[in-house]
């Protein structure tokens, strides 16, 4: 098996199980309808764990462009492999979402809520505020990539890495996932969003492309910063990349804060 195929299959499994649990919870007349956020968070952790076990021996199971780019940025992964990895991840995510569509085929007809149908495939903010939504994705993915690196470096985790990473995903989902639904992975959102756009889902509405840049840019920035932060703080490699990404993250935080203050003032004056 090639690394490209391993990333494709691993990401496909991740999306089948992750998007699948959201479908079960959101779609009408599903046996899991209304089961809630805790189930979704746990299932996404298991989805990542099983995807990682599927691909780990071949490709180290990145399954996420934010991970691939973060590792490449600090020299832990060769840049010439990045296109194949990300291509495999995106294709796997699209295929996985299409499989979920067929798994729940009659339930699309039973579900009238367009936002629920889109929510099966793609993330969306609980409160739409692009600067704050971007920061949420940056922080979530920062924690993810930082966690992957310190888990990987810890001898106590040897042999259990995929399971512990799965628990990391559960923790991120429960603690940080509320504002945006925690994409923390560009292809986890983009692949299923493409599937939503092309599939003949009854009464589906639009695919909310105006929001789609948030779960792409946020995870990339957060993932790369998480890698530079680990390299700087844990390994002492404080270079230009760390300072540049630190400035970018600080600017994002300041922009989100002042945008929220502006909205608060507008609400108070209206």
Locations of regions flagged by a protein language model:
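Membrane-interface helix-loop junctions and terminal tails of multi-pass membrane proteins
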Residues: 1-270
